[in-house]
Amino acid sequence: MDQNQLDPSVPSATEVKKIPLVIKVYAILCILTGVSTLPSVAAFMWQVITSLVNGNAAEKLGDNMLVAIGLIVAGIMLSAASAVILIIFGLDLIKNQRRNAARLSYILIAFTVIELLVDVMLQGIGPFLLRPAIQLVILVALSATVDPTLRQERELQRRLQEMLDRDAAAEGMLGRDETGEGYIKLNYFNLFWVFFVCCILGLIAEDIWHMTVDDPGVYQDRAGMLFGPFSPIYGFGAVLMTMALNRFYKKNPIIIFLVSALLGASFEVFVGWFMQTSFGVVSWSYSHMKLFGMPDPIAVLTGGRTCMGFACLWGLGGLIWIKLLLPRLLKLINMIPWKSRYSATVIFTIIMLVDGVMTLQSLDYWYQRVNGTEPDIPVAQFYGKYFDNDYMENRFQSMTMSPKDATRV
């Protein structure tokens, strides 16, 4: 009697297909990395405890000792958890348990991204980021290919989506959420162009605000990237707002306002804290803000990284965004010619990635020059020649650099 091919308990032909040799080699490397990481993590944890007990942690950890210790502990816990998952992930690959390996790859991707952020805050930009960066690329590739059933599902969905997109374009609904639960379809194409356009619109809005409110009549370049008219905080903020508010677009405006205010203010606090912790850079401060003649309590609690007034502006901005601007932006996005929309997205993604990486590197070497710790290497010499302190101060006019505020170890 033939086996029921629809029975999920019966492996399909693609599921029993052998894992390629190169992936098996990678699986062994994952296991070895995980096994070797655990004792290294334990040894490093012992060094941290010893330094704290002996009282010489302040010398090693700098002025922001508590923040540095918190980041180190978080990094240790993250490394230990990642090591265990890497071992299980490698074993699953060897055992040909593709679906479970695919699930674990998503967890490892999230952990690796957080690990990269923690490493930047503790050590800045350097060759030590290559390992997690390469691992991230491999994991992203594996997550899409290791499970052939998932790959086939994606291919079928892609072909179906192309037909649906063409039908939607004919009906004027291209880019909309077909389920009706949200306004916009949350795919990479839509979100990237939301990010790109809002990087520019946000910079224009901030420049106008500075010239009319902060310092009337005085122009200041508020750009946040090394090249181009981009302010990424508004780009990422718009993406977060779009993802968070997508299913709220039919809700009560008060709810949209409150969700936007909380999300926007929290994001502003995180970005300000990350930049100050990583590079000693402060781009804005609301410490001087008052509320009914008293110090703004939110500004006090967040170290001046946000305040009640700007939280309300985030709330109003989110409401205007989801109700008025997003529908018009979607129409603008859909003006990109059908045959070139994906190639254009890839090209501009690469441009923004290069710009972003060079921005972080230039900030890192600016920090090291001011701190007197710049290494004598070709990359540092390149940034020192073409993007020296005067250039950085002129390019990032709203930023102040204070190395003592960073938590470099």
Give short role names for the model-derived ranges.
Residues 2-409:
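Aromatic-rich, lipid-facing transmembrane alpha helices and their immediate juxtamembrane interface loops
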